[in-house]
Amino acid sequence: MGRFEGKVAVVTGAGAGIGKACALAIAREGGRVVVADIDGSAAIACTAQIAAEAGHALALAIDIADAQAVAALFETAERHFGGVDLLVNNASAMHLTPRDRAILELELAVWDQTMATNLRGTLLCCRQAIPRMIARGGGAIVNMSSCQGLSGDTALTSYAASKAAMNMLSSSLATQYGHAQIRCNAVAPGLIMTERLLAKLDACMQTHLRRHQLLPRVGRPEDVAALVAFLLSDDAAFITGQVVCIDGGMLAHVPTYADGGNSRAARPAGETAEADAAPRC
C-alpha cells in the first residue's frame, strides 16, 4: 500500500520539471493528484502519464496569482476528489528570471510579477488549502523554495527575495496551524537539471556550478520529488516548520572550495588534476 492511498494532492507548476516529478511520485504511491499549471497542455500531458500508470489525476490550467482562479482550483479539487490533504506549491515565475537583475537594473514590473506568482500565489493556495485540510483532520504542505533564498547573488534579486519570504511564510504557517495537525515545510533545491535549465545553461556554466557541489553529479527532479514525498508522508509526521536544502552540498562548504588552487575541490567525472590550473569559464 502506497503512502498516499486515500489522499488528495494539489501540485502547482506540475506540467514539467520538479512539479511534474512530484505529481508522478505522489500518484505512484496511491495519491489522487490535481495537476495544476499555467500551461494547460503540459498539465494534460502529465495527467495522461499518470493515467497510463494506472493513477488518478485531474489537469487544470491556472495562473496562481489570480485569487478567483485559485479558489476555483480548490473548489474543483474538492468537488472531483472530495477534499484536499496535501499541497505542493511549486509554481514559479521562471520566465522572468532572464530580466531579474541587480537592484539598480531591476524593472519594478519584474519584481511585482515575481512576487505575485511566487509569494502571493503560494499564499493564495495555502489560504484555500488550510480550511479543507482542517475539515479532513489535518494535512501537509510543501513550499518549493530555493537555495537562492538562502544566499545573495549578483542577479535574481526578485526571485531570491520571494524564496526567502516563502521560507518565513512556511514557518509562520507551521506555527499557526500545527495545532490543527497541519504541517508545512519548505524545500530549497540547488542545481537541479530540469529541461528548462538544461536549455538555458551552457556547458561552461554547468561546469562552474558543478565545482561548487560536493557530490559528483547534478541533481535530478526525481531527487527533489523523493524529498517532497517524504515530507508529505506520515514518515515525516514530526517534521514541520523546516527549510530543507537539497543541493548536493552546494551551500555546505567554504567559499574557497571550488577555487583553482584548491586541489581537493571536486572535479567532474573524468577531469584530471591538471584541470585545476586551467583558466576558469
UniProtKB/Swiss-Prot annotation:
Residues where NAD(+) binds: 10-34
> Which keywords describe this protein according to UniProt?
Oxidoreductase
Q: Report residues binding substrate.
A: S146
**Active-site residue numbers:** Y159 (proton acceptor)
Q: What are the start and end residues of every segment in region (Disordered)?
A: 261-281
Instruction: Offer an example of a GO molecular function term for this protein.
Output: oxidoreductase activity
Provide the protein name.
Probable short-chain type dehydrogenase/reductase blr2146
